[in-house]
């Protein structure tokens, strides 16, 4: 059972009043090493899938960069439920993590010259 603390709600109400606006930072070093930073706690499958799709020698994925926007569960995790996938602790829209990973992938491919 997920523990809920109503007294914590005011702490997040102001922060997320205009919705969740996560930050994404992507850098590519020598065409071999991708650095991806996001402002939140992303479920590990996001980074695993990104690494498989990016096709660079090394990909380093960092959470908690330039802010913190709670949890970004995978769509599958939301469907399964459980800690971190409940909207009480994950105010991001379902699929937001996948959208951010797609943006990161596009940026990596642009830096590699594969997409203009």
Task: Kindly give the residue locations of the regions a language model identified.
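Non-catalytic substrate/cofactor recognition surfaces at enzyme active-site rims
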Residues: 1-116
